[in-house]
Swiss-Prot record:
The gene is Crz. One of its GO terms (biological process) is acetaldehyde metabolic process. It comes from Drosophila erecta (Fruit fly). The modification Asparagine amide is found at residue 30. Residues 70-154 form a propeptide. Belongs to the corazonin family. GO terms for molecular function: corazonin receptor binding; neuropeptide hormone activity. This is Pro-corazonin. Pfam families: Corazonin (PF17308).
Length: 154
């Protein structure tokens, strides 16, 4: 009697586990099983919760757009860092005008940050002035330092 009860229960449990494994291996979750591009009201006349765009899909869409924005920002930062570090003799200014761009080893690197507000040539004197003011304040507050030329190295 006990075997007759346990055998169907075991088979049912096994089939449920196999079904869930199949669904998740195909990427099917509760919000993504069925997505109809047409409006659910137009196709059936009734609003079915299973065929509308779920909240999890909206969050995925927002994550995708923010990921694209973050990727674009990081690639712009990477290009600016490459432009600053790869050009020999650069004064940390990627906007300087090269007299002969065809003879330069890196013709594109001089114009990478023209549209970037943070690294525009208008901000360069302000940035140097701020760092010099900080250096003067630190040297005035610290008095005689054990390493007097720490900030001059950078």
């Amino acid at each position: 009697m006990l075997r007759l009860l346990l055998l169907p229960l075991f088979l049912f449990t096994l089939s449920m586990c196999m079904g869930q494994t199949f669904q998740y291996s195909r990427g099917w979750t509760n919000g993504k099983r069925s997505f109809n591009a047409a409006s659910p009201l137009l196709t059936t006349g009734h609003l079915h919760r299973g065929s509308e765009l779920g909240l999890s899909d909206l969050y995925d869409l927002q994550e995708w757009t923010s990921d694209r924005r973050l990727e674009r920002c990081l690639s712009q930062l990477q290009r600016s860092l490459i432009a600053r570090n790869c050009v020999p003799g650069s004064d940390f200014n990627a906007n300087r005008v090269d007299p002969d761009p065809e003879s330069s080893a890196h013709p594109r690197l001089g114009n990478i940050n023209n549209e970037n507000v943070l690294y525009s040539s208008a901000n360069v004197p302000t940035r140097h002035r701020q760092s010099n003011e900080l250096l003067e304040e630190l040297s005035a507050a610290g008095g005689a330092s054990a390493e007097p030329n720490v900030f001059g190295k950078h």
